[in-house]
Amino acid sequence: MLQNTFIHIQSIGAITEQRLWESGLRDWDEFTDDISIPLSGRRKYLLQKGIDESRQHLYQNNPVYFSKCLPANQSWRFFPEFRNSIAYLDIETTGLDRHYHSITTIALYDGESVQTYVQGQNLEDFIEDIQKYKVIVTYNGKSFDIPFIEHFFNIKLGQAHIDLRYILYSLGFRGGLKGCERQLGMDRGDLSVDGHAKASTTEKPDAGKPHVRV
C-alpha cells in the first residue's frame, strides 16, 4: 500500500491523490517524465521529488519519514512494510497527570509474545527493549502513552508511531477504546472495564474526538 501512496508528498491532498489514481498513476514506479496527470508543472516536479525521497527512505528502512509526512489517520499505510519491527504498546498509571503520577505497568506485544514491565520489578528494562522496534502502535498514545513514558523515564521515543485512535475515528468509530471494541464486536468479558472507571487508579482516560490534524 505504501508505494500506492502520494498523500504524504508536498502539495498532494486526498482529492489530488484520488485524481492521480484515476488518471492511471497508481504507484511510484508508474511515474515518468512524460506521464499525463492532472498537475501543473510545479506540482508535478514536487511529486517527482517526493517519490524519489520516498523511495530513498523506504530503501533505508526508515518509517519515521512516512510517520511524519502522513496525516495521523493515514499512518496505517506504512504498516505492511514495517510490520516485522512493530511494538504494540499500552501503559497503566497511578493517575492522568504525567507530572505527578507514575507508570505502574507497561505491556508490549511484538506480534509473537507479550512482555510486561512492572514497577518495582523490571520497569526500567523497557527503556532498552523498546529500542529494538522501528514502529510503535498505540491507542491514544499521541496524547497519553508516549508523553507519559517520555516524561517518566526522561527519554525521547523517536520511533514512527501509529495511533489507532485517529484511524478508527476517521472510520466512524467513537467512544474511546472500549466503545470502539464494542462497535467492532470485540468482547473481553470482565477485562472490558470502562476507561473512566479506572482512570483514578491505574489506567489512561477514555479518549474521544482527536485534537490533532487528521
Where are these regions (language model features)?
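Conserved DEDDh/DEDDy metal-dependent 3′-5′ exonuclease domain
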Residues: T105-K198
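Short, flexible loop/turn motifs enriched in small residues
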Residues: R98-T104
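Two-metal-ion RNase H-like nuclease active-site motif
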Residues: N84-T94
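N-terminal accessory regions of nucleic-acid-interacting proteins
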Residues: M1-F82
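Catalytic micro-motifs at enzyme active sites that drive phosphoryl/nucleotidyl and oxygen chemistry
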Residues: Q74-F79, T93-D97, D125-F126
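Long, charge-rich alpha-helical interaction segments
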Residues: D190-V214
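Short gly/ser/thr-rich secondary-structure transition/capping motifs
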Residues: C69-A72, L89, Y117-Q119
